[in-house]
């Protein structure tokens, strides 16, 4: 018995030792795994810090950039994207440049940066396109905007690398209260930017603005560009109603006009060249007027004056400058033309081509214009009478002529050529009979093929009718007339029903999701009002397209954003496929993808568009926090 107990004790001791050894082994393995993981992380960090060379070009990133450039006087940088076709095409040339500059005395480093992964550097150097080339001189970036040829780039780099090289003075003029009036009043035309030093949009505009200034300074005569620090020159900012940054204004001999052009070099240059020309063209012969009326396709605007020194003519020119992007203005000093138009000199005449005239509206709209007439009054008169009672809506004039709502559109085969004009006018005349009784609405005819997508979205492409009609209202909603034989009576009933609020809108929509509990709410056409326009909640809405590369890149970031704010009951992070669903409020304009708006609770008609800044978690979070009307803590803050 004692012997058996002894054996049991021996076995227990042996088992205990085995378990201890196994545990130690596991611990050793765990430690090894941890050490291996740490070593792998350190290797990855080392990879980021190590500067590699590919075909003579140094490869830089956010991690190794500062150390690499710290001791170098001059470095040539190329910011590229792996998918960029121009970058791929430029690569062999860039390698030749690297080889040439490597043999320079002293050698000049040539480097490239993948701007899609080195986001900090891309942001620091304001990279907005690919490839972007910059020359780093003693740590300061010098923009290169010449051709992408070895000869020109090498020459510029060598020029900048010289010990006595200094940046050229800015071409953009700096204005203060002391010199503003002298400069602006004496310029036939000048573009002035009111900026704030801390403004991100201003910083982004600055290099493009300077490049445009350089380009326009070469013209004969030159077109000057200037800038005003509105935070310092507060009196000037107040004088010209500057309420945001940057604000750009065109001045003609001291008279201010809004700048509505692009904000990059070539866009600014083209816009200012166009603006520098006369806003109104002189008509010299009666034949020109007759051709406008016979063959024209838009409103005919003619000012008739005593001469180019007539004060009324100068006021007309001011009005024309305000509207020159939307209308073609003409003027004449010819008594013969005045007689043909049955007016005296000192008048503004608006008329429409013969095909758009009708018995329900005057042939000519005439306004007295004197030296005391305000340019704004002329402008208002032109806008008021620019459309005929029933005009021709086309894709080329839609944005400028038919943006006003409600808009009644009648779709059929519209063709004003000789063979088909009678048929086109037959249906247009039926529309005219209704339009005359609803002056508060805009009426137009439109070719059904030009607007095939719109007709399809209205559910009318398979109507079986030759003529269809719809109404587009102020909120972005669309109403389709039930398919039936078209005549004036059916159109009148349709418009009357709309006026009384008895019509239901047509909404293009994907199916409503059955399960919509994810971190990012899916919005479709039928749920836009319920989710985005919910007056009790703040909503961040992304409008995307399934084929859009930038949208695909944003998707994981946007999902992370949704998870971050998931616990906030008064905030919704949402997305909508804008190619498959109607946006039922026209305040949410989408001109590209992705487009992001913040719709604040209680103020849904004034959404705030996300502009500038990177579409990353940090910047999107900051955007939300800045505009949130009801703030609660996120998961990260708890």
Curated annotation (Swiss-Prot):
The keyword Protein transport does not apply. Belongs to the protein disulfide isomerase family. Glycans are attached at residue 36. It is an enzyme of class 5 (isomerase). The modification N6-acetyllysine is found at residue 359. A motif (Prevents secretion from ER) lies at residues 635-638. GO terms for molecular function: integrin binding; protein disulfide isomerase activity. The gene is Pdia4. Residues 1-20 form the signal peptide. It comes from Mus musculus. Residues 24-50 are annotated as: Disordered. This is Protein disulfide-isomerase A4. It catalyses: Catalyzes the rearrangement of -S-S- bonds in proteins. Part of a large chaperone multiprotein complex comprising DNAJB11, HSP90B1, HSPA5, HYOU, PDIA2, PDIA4, PDIA6, PPIB, SDF2L1, UGGT1 and very small amounts of ERP29, but not, or at very low levels, CALR nor CANX. Component of a complex containing at least CRELD2, MANF, MATN3 and PDIA4. A motif (CXXC) lies at residues 84-87, 548-551. InterPro entries: PDI_thioredoxin-like_dom (IPR005788), PDIA4_PDI_b (IPR041866), Prot_disulphide_isomerase (IPR005792), Protein_diS-isomerase_A4 (IPR017068), Thioredoxin-like_sf (IPR036249), Thioredoxin_CS (IPR017937), Thioredoxin_domain (IPR013766). GO terms for cellular component: cell surface; endoplasmic reticulum; endoplasmic reticulum chaperone complex; endoplasmic reticulum lumen; melanosome. Disulfide bonds join 84-87, 199-202, 548-551.
